[in-house]
Each structure stands twice: as C-alpha cells, then as structure tokens.
Amino acid sequence: VVWRLNAWRTLPAMCVAVGLLMCLPLWQKPRPDEWQVYMLDVGQGLAMVIARNGKAILYDTGLAWPEGDSGQQLIIPWLHWHNLEPEGVILSHEHLDHRGGLDSILHTWPMLWIRSPLNWEHHQPCVRGEAWQWQGLRFSAHWPLQGSNDKGNNHSCVVKIDDGTNSILLTGDIEAPAEQKMLSRYWQQMQATLLQVPHHGSNTSSSLPLIQRVNGKVALASASRYNAWRLPSSKVKHRYQQQGYKWLDTPHQGQITVNFSAQGWRISSLREQILPRWYHQWFGVPVDNG
C-alpha cells in the first residue's frame, strides 16, 4: 500500500490535534446554564448521552457482538474520561443494537435507574404521558401508548428533552406506521429544535408528516460507515434537507456534540476537529451512503 505523501506531511500536526482534543475534558468545565447531548459513534447502533452538571443519562447503549459490546469498549471509558456520572438509562426498545451495552454499564453502575417500554423487571415505564424533571430539564415520553404489548421498532420510546427554550426529540427506531399513530393524536407536542433521525435513517421511517410536525433545525443520524444496509438512505436525507433541516450523521461526522446554553446551541463533530483533510485523504468520504 502506498500512502499519499500529503497525508504523511500532516501526521505531526494530526498527533498534536489529537493530543489537544484528548485533553479538552481536563480543562473545560461547562457553565451551570449549559447542557450537552452527545451522539456517540458506536457503529450500526445508537447510544446518546445527555449531560449536565457532571451527571448523565443514556438514551440507548449501542450494540453487542461475541467478543464484547459498546458499553464495555466505548461508553464506559468515554464517561470516565469526561468525568460524567451516569444516573439512569432510557432504553428505546429491546433490539440488540440499542441495548447491547446495557449489562456492562449496569455491572459498572448497578444503581442506575432504567426507563423503557418493555415491562421488564426493575424498569420504570417509558410510555405516553410519563414526564419527569432531571437537572432542570423536562423529559416527556410521547410513545408508545400505555397498555400496549407490542414489541420492536414501532414500540420505541420517543422522548422529548426540553430546557424551556430548546429541545431534542429522541425517537429510537420508530417507523412510519407508529409515527402516523403518534402524530394523529399528539402532533401539537412534537415540535423540537433537533431530531434524532429514526431507525438509523431507514426509508421505513422519517415520514414527511413527522419531519414537518417536528419542524426542527437539525437532523442527527447514527449508523456505521459503509454499512451493508446503505444507511442513512439518500431519500431520507433529501427529505429532511428539503424541509430546511441541517443533516449530520456519524458515518461522516463521527461523534456529534450539541451544546445548549442561554445563548442558544452549537454543534461540533469529532472528525471536524481532528484534521478533516487528513481523514478524508486516507479514508475517503463517499458522496452518499444510501
């Protein structure tokens, strides 16, 4: 293999950039009015962290494989490095690419509370009508309906997190049939600043009515780079962009960070911070993933 000479010239600068980036948690202390949402780069799964005042809540825990899981390999070290103490987990649904890291996380922090729509032992309900406060943020569940015994994607717990000015809607793997049912009754409460794109950007989800009712500014999608399903779908990405959303996804941006404050919100991504030209030269960025 012959590497590009330009890439080698940037290697020292890249090493310095990585070193500085790794030190950021050591000197950056968020202000009390700030809170963060992180979409971690866990591959073909979903794991998000909501953080404020040194505490954290997880929304999904990534995937599992025969030799390990996202909790053990990524989420636990990441939380330790950022000096975040998790207090709870919201599990959208039972599929392994969303709950794969849960056991490892509970082994490290056995006192965590869990909310889910699964009716499993020791799980608090995450169903329509549930609402709670955490660190000054309001969490409200909008799907599934209470008493539903369905499973799978369309039983995903849809949660809105709101600071009174800005908000994010977390959707798990909800698909178009459930989106339609949810919007037919509760569309007035769906508006949010940011939206986690359902089901990794699959065309089975993100119906136009959902995109329009949320009326957000940014769509965030989690998927693996060059995945076999070609997600996120180019049709879905175009659908969001046609409605005025800025589109970001982990296959292209890596970890995505949203910082909310009294001044508004701003987004940064890991690959933008670690010399994107170097990254693109060596690994390439496809025009489209689906």
PLM regions with names:
Residues 1-290:
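Non-globular, low-confidence helical/coil segments that flank catalytic cores
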